[in-house]
Amino acid sequence: MKTPRLPIAIQQAVMRSLRDALARANLKLGRNYPEPKLVYQQRGTAAGTAWLESYEIRLNPVLLMENQQAFIDEVVPHELAHLLVWKHFGRVPPHGKEWKWMMESVLGVPARRTHQFELDSVRANTFPYRCRCQQHQLTIRRHNRVVRGETQYRCVRCGDTLVAEN
C-alpha cells in the first residue's frame, strides 16, 4: 500500500501537539528535555512507536489521516511519554507505573495502552485457518512459516493445530 502524502497542516498540528506536551512536561518536571524527531513511517496496525535510542516518534500516516484529532490528543502524548520516561527513569516496563504517572500526572492525558481505530485500511492480507472450534486469520508472515514447515500454530481455546482452509 502506498503511504499517503500528509498535508502540511496535519504535520503542523502534530508538531504543535508534541511541542505543547513537551513544554508542559518540561515545566512540571523542571527539566529541559529536547524535542524528539517525528517520522511518519510507522506501518501496520500500530498507531505509533517511540524509538528510545534514536529519540524519535514514528507515526502511522494512514491512521493519522483517518484519526487526526485522536492522534493529536492521545497518540502523540502516548509516544512522547515513553521517551520522557526513558529519559527520566531509564529502562522501565513500557506501560508501567512510571509511564502511567507521566501520562496522567505530567501530560494530563488518560493512560490508555491501545487505540480503538478502525484498521481495515492498514490490515494486511490474512489467510483462513481452522481448528475444531473456530476459524482463525493468520498474517502472511505466519502463513508462510506454516507453508515452509517452520512452525505450527495452535488454537488457544481448544488446543488444536490450525489447518489452512482451501
Swiss-Prot record:
Cofactor binding note from Swiss-Prot or TrEMBL: Binds 1 zinc ion.
Residue ranges occupied by any SprT-like domain in the UniProt entry: 19-164
Thylakoid is among the record's keywords: no
Keywords of the record: Cytoplasm, Metal-binding, Zinc
Cofactor requirement: Zn(2+)
Binding site for Zn(2+): H78, H82
Primary localisation category: cytoplasm
One of the GO biological process terms: response to stress
Pfam family name, one: Zn_ribbon_SprT
Subcellular compartments: Cytoplasm
InterPro entries: SprT-like_domain, SprT_Zn_ribbon, Uncharacterised_SprT
Cellular component terms (Gene Ontology): cytoplasm
Domain of life of the source: Bacteria
Active-site feature positions: E79
MF-aspect GO terms: zinc ion binding
Family label: Belongs to the SprT family.
Annotated protein name in UniProt: Protein SprT
Species of provenance: Cronobacter sakazakii (strain ATCC BAA-894)
Underlying gene: sprT
